[in-house]
C-alpha cells in the first residue's frame, strides 16, 4: 500500500489515547495533526514524541497575534520539529512575513482564513477567503488551509493546499 496524502487528526487531550490508531496508520498516511487541545494539554513533548516515532507533524495552532509573538511561536514550532504550522491570515502581513522570515527551513506555514469559521457559506464569504488568500500569497507563506469549495481559485495561487476533513451529511459533528 502506498502512503496516502492524509493527516490523521489527533483531536483530543492525550497522545496515549491514539496509540492503537497510530500503530495501524504508520506507513499508510502522510502524517498526523496535533491540535490546540492536545498541544495545550501535553505541550511540545507531544510533537517531539511523534517526530521521534518518525511522523510528519502538522501543528494546527492557528496563531493569531502581534508579529513578534507569531515570529517567536514559529521559531519554537520549528525547534520542536513541527513540519507544518497554521497561522491566521488575519494576523496581518507583518506577522505573516515575520513568521516566514524566521521559521526553520523545514517548517511550512499554512494560512487559515478567519472567514472559514463561519457555518453559513455565501458568495461574500468566498470573496473574503479569496482576499485573505491573496494576502497570504503576497506574504510568501507556503500554503493555505482551503475548503473544497474554493479549490479551483486557490490552485491559481498556491501549490501547497490542505483541505480539512470532510464530514458526511449524516455524521454527528461532535464540535
Language-model features and meaning:
Residues 29-84:
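Metabolite-binding pocket within alpha/beta catalytic cores that recognizes anionic/polar moieties
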Residues 1, 27-28, 52-55, 103-107:
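Short helix-capping segments at alpha-helix termini
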Residues 2-3, 65-162, 166-173:
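Conserved anion-binding
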Residues 10, 59-61, 164:
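Active-site flanking residues adjacent to catalytic metal/cofactor-binding acidic residues
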Residues 8, 62, 136:
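Residue-level signature of catalytic and energy-coupling elements of molecular machines
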Residues 1-24:
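N-terminal glycine-rich anion-binding loop in soluble enzyme alpha/beta folds
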Amino acid at each position: 500500500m502506498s502512503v496516502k496524502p492524509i493527516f490523521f487528526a489527533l483531536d483530543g487531550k492525550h497522545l496515549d489515547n491514539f496509540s492503537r490508531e497510530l500503530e495501524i496508520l504508520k506507513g499508510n498516511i502522510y502524517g498526523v495533526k496535533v491540535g490546540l487541545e492536545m498541544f495545550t494539554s501535553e505541550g511540545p513533548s507531544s510533537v517531539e514524541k511523534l517526530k521521534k516515532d518518525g511522523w510528519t507533524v502538522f501543528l494546527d495552532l492557528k496563531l493569531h497575534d502581534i508579529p513578534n509573538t507569531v515570529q517567536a511561536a514559529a521559531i519554537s514550532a520549528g525547534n520542536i520539529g513541527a513540519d507544518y504550522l497554521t497561522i491566521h491570515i488575519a494576523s496581518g502581513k507583518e506577522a505573516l512575513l515575520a513568521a516566514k522570515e524566521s521559521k526553520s527551513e523545514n517548517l511550512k506555514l499554512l494560512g487559515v482564513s478567519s472567514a472559514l469559521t463561519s457555518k453559513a457559506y455565501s458568495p461574500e464569504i468566498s470573496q473574503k477567503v479569496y482576499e485573505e488568500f491573496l494576502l497570504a500569497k503576497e506574504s510568501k507563506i507556503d500554503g493555505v488551509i482551503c475548503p473544497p469549495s474554493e479549490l479551483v481559485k486557490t490552485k491559481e495561487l498556491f501549490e501547497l493546499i490542505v483541505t480539512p476533513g470532510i464530514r458526511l451529511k449524516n455524521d454527528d459533528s461532535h464540535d
